Swiss-Prot record:
It comes from the Bacteria. GO terms for molecular function: ATP binding; ATP hydrolysis activity; ATP-dependent protein folding chaperone; protein dimerization activity; unfolded protein binding; zinc ion binding. Belongs to the ClpX chaperone family. CDD domains: RecA-like_ClpX. One of its GO terms (biological process) is cell division. Zn(2+) binds at residues 15, 18, 37, 40. ATP-dependent specificity component of the Clp protease. It directs the protease to specific substrates. Can perform chaperone functions in the absence of ClpP. SUPFAM superfamilies: Glucocorticoid receptor-like (DNA-binding domain), P-loop containing nucleoside triphosphate hydrolases. Keywords: ATP-binding, Chaperone, Metal-binding, Nucleotide-binding, Zinc. One of its GO terms (cellular component) is HslUV protease complex. ATP binds at residues 119-126. This is ATP-dependent Clp protease ATP-binding subunit ClpX. Component of the ClpX-ClpP complex. Forms a hexameric ring that, in the presence of ATP, binds to fourteen ClpP subunits assembled into a disk-like structure with a central cavity, resembling the structure of eukaryotic proteasomes.
């Protein structure tokens, strides 16, 4: 029985799980000889929810349906329905291909690597991170900007397979069924349209090195990193069944697409629309493989990623939803931070819309929302721990626009009236 007797606290009840008193939590629920607080109940629900998601892959002979995968992505990623469908179908087919290969059928199913293209802050990396939470196959994320050709300072492409091995606890058979996400792949584009006469060790050279592992080869992977321990034995990993997903912002690609589309309208009746009048996501929908070649990807590299998925710009409504709806929503995070100071944080709807508009103006997408909120709340978070009696902080649209200070509402004490500062 979580009850303390003696002194002033003889009637105080405590949670049997976390030990917090009834005064530290919103609700304390009594059971036979035990108590549980609302915070522990929420934690238990989160644990059960995560276990349900991780057991997603147990349905239908171990193959989750595209709708099930897309449903989990919807919990964390706002919008981008087309990209979610592409990823869901690709992962579903990846599972089916693995099961098909295990049955030694006469038809060989080839994998379809994916290239995700979209403006910065639209959710490419978050989609990959969310996939990693729910999949029952080894998953790793790599950064293309750190890769160089073998023999130069930087990471070899084999290090990607090493990370996959580590996520599979060095089980080679499991690693050979995994999924690899390579981020910032646009940063390894060729530095000019023409083949370089000098060594491009972090651009075209990396693309050449990635070709074989993406298509399928037996890679020799040093378990401790090849350059530091040259005498170690190598592990042999077959990359034929590893699914590769590449993502990048490809800044400037919309201009290449726009130049190609300029010749479409001729004559008095032609509709002419400048690239500036269209949003980046809309322009990217007209993407053709030849545009990627002009951007600096080599033909062989583009050919190994047959599935192209473009992501859209996030509009004001999408950014507003990102601020408030997901489990890791920024507004919820800051509300919890203020709760730790026993202060309620309130945003007006107009304030949240002003934050969304500011992110659109900066062209930083969802990634820029946190920096905007930080700048708005910086002075308040600095002053709050030393202020007494503050019950609520209200953020209005004027505060976001820099025309006013946050409103502080004080608790009434012995007849005093609350004031705003």
């Amino acid at each position: 029985m979580s009850k303390v007797s003696g002194g002033d606290s003889k009637n105080t009840l405590y949670c049997s799980f976390c030990g917090k008193s009834q005064h530290e939590v919103r609700k304390l629920i009594a059971g036979p000889t035990v108590f549980i607080c609302d915070e522990c109940v929420e934690l238990c629900m989160d644990i059960i929810r995560e276990e349900n998601k991780s057991s997603l892959v147990k349905s239908r002979d171990g193959v989750p349906s595209p709708q099930e995968i897309c449903g989990v992505l919807d919990d964390y990623v706002i919008g981008q329905q087309h990209a979610k469908r592409v990823l869901s179908v690709a992962v579903h087919n990846h599972y089916k291909r693995l099961n098909h290969a295990a049955k030694n059928n006469d038809v060989e199913l080839a994998k379809s690597n994916i290239l995700l293209i979209g403006p910065t802050g639209c959710g490419k990396t978050l989609l990959a991170q969310t996939l990693a939470r729910i999949l029952d196959v080894p998953f790793t994320m790599a950064d293309a900007t750190t890769l160089t050709e073998a023999g130069y300072v930087g990471e070899d492409v084999e290090n990607i397979i090493l990370k996959l091995l580590q996520s599979a606890d060095y089980n080679v058979e499991r690693a050979q069924r995994g999924i690899v996400y390579i981020d910032e792949v646009d940063k390894i584009s060729r530095k000019s349209d023409n083949p370089s006469i000098t060594r491009d060790v972090s651009g075209e050279g990396v693309q050449q090195a990635l070709l074989k592992i993406m298509e399928g080869t037996v890679a020799s992977v040093p378990p401790q990193g090849g350059r530091k321990h040259p005498q170690q034995e190598f592990l042999q990993v077959d990359t034929t069944n590893i699914l590769f997903i590449c993502g990048g912002a490809f800044a400037g690609l919309e201009k290449i697409i726009g130049q190609r589309g300029k010749g479409a309208g001729i004559g008095f009746g032609a509709k002419v629309q400048s690239v500036e009048d269209r949003r980046t996501g809309d322009i990217l929908k007209d993407l053709e493989p030849e545009d990627l070649l002009k951007f600096g990807l080599i033909p062989e590299f583009v050919g190994r990623m047959p599935v192209l998925a473009t992501l859209e710009d996030l509009d004001e409504e999408a950014l507003l939803t990102i601020l408030t709806q997901p489990k890791n929503a920024l507004v919820k995070q800051y509300e919890r931070l203020f709760e730790m100071e026993n202060v309620r944080l309130t945003f007006s709807e107009e304030a949240l819309r002003a934050v969304s508009r500011k992110a659109i103006e900066r062209k930083t997408g969802a990634r820029g929302l946190r920096s905007i909120l930080e700048s708005i709340l910086l002075d308040t978070m600095f002053e709050l721990p030393t202020l007494e009696g503050v019950e609520e902080v209200v953020i209005s649209a004027e505060v976001v626009e820099g025309k006013a200070r946050p409103l502080y509402i004080y608790a009434e004490r012995q007849g005093d009236v609350g004031t705003g500062a």
